[in-house]
Regions:
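Proline/glycine-rich low-complexity loops and linkers
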Residues: 49-52, 59, 76-179
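Structural motif
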Residues: 3-5, 62-63, 127, 138, ...
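An accessory alpha-helical subdomain
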Residues: 152-254
Length: 257
């Protein structure tokens, strides 16, 4: 099973000027293919912080996906940080993205400036997925096992929501082509008439006896009660569903329901 970290980069996120809608969309797409998201992290446009945080996330996860910091202005420094992390010694022009820069700006009736052309410059250590929705490419950095103790891949996506969301299918396709993936299965039951703390006490022995590969989450709602979610990562979907159904069947007599 592959673990993933989703990182949003940009001062505008930290000061509340922009709401991060990308992470939830990316997380759902990863969940659908059996990738477990372990962390979501937001940090600002600071060179050292980008390097330190991404190094930490790459050490702990097989997949790291970043959004933001790839624009053409001086405050967009993610590309330079990624070049340093990956040991890049030079930048190269990606012809596919350069063509897209011209097409997008011409369609908007805008001149193509040098600052726009620079969007197609990428570190020589990355692969490129052409961004058909904007001018900044999706950069893919693949790290060997010697670097972080395991093979790791970093996908750097633009932060503009419609561009990031538009790039998700291509990123997911690449992950499926390079990772050994397993199914993830979740199932929920609703419990009424008990607060979360009281419910936790009531089912403590049942929770303690759950198999190690099964995870329980409490999802309280003041209007509808407490939703209990059981999750299994790995195995076949049919087997996972059967096992979860058995555990919920054991729960019913405990609750007297």
């Amino acid at each position: 099973m592959a673990n993933a970290s989703i990182c949003t980069i940009g001062d505008e996120i930290l000061i509340g000027q922009i709401v991060d809608t990308n992470s939830s969309q990316i997380s759902r797409a990863l969940e659908d293919i059996g990738v477990k998201v372990t962390r979501m992290v937001s940090f600002g446009d600071d060179h050292d912080e980008i390097i330190n945080t991404l190094t930490k996330e790459l050490t702990s996860n097989e997949i790291v996906i970043t959004t933001g910091g790839l624009g053409p202005t001086k405050d967009d420094i993610t590309k330079a940080a990624l070049a340093e992390i990956s040991g890049s010694e030079s930048y190269v022009v990606n012809d596919g993205q350069l063509k897209m820069v011209h097409e997008i700006l011409h369609a908007r009736g805008l001149d193509v400036l040098d600052i726009n052309k620079a969007q197609a410059l990428v570190p020589d250590t990355c692969e490129v997925i052409v961004n058909h929705m904007g001018t900044a490419p999706i950069m893919v950095f693949r790290f060997p096992v010697e670097r972080f103790g395991h093979e790791a891949t970093l996908y750097a996506m633009p932060g503009v929501p419609f561009e990031a969301i538009g790039a998700i299918p291509d990123v997911i396709k690449d992950i499926k082509a390079h990772e050994s993936l397993t199914d993830i299965f979740h199932k929920c039951v609703m419990v009424f008439g008990l607060a979360e703390s009281a419910l936790s006490k009531e089912i403590e022995s049942w929770e303690d006896s759950l198999p190690e590969d099964m995870h329980l989450a409490y999802l309280p709602n003041p209007l509808t009660g407490v939703r209990l979610r059981l999750s299994i990562y790995g195995g076949s979907r049919e087997e996972e569903e059967r096992r979860i159904d058995e555990e919920f069947a054991r729960l019913k007599p405990i609750l007297g329901r």
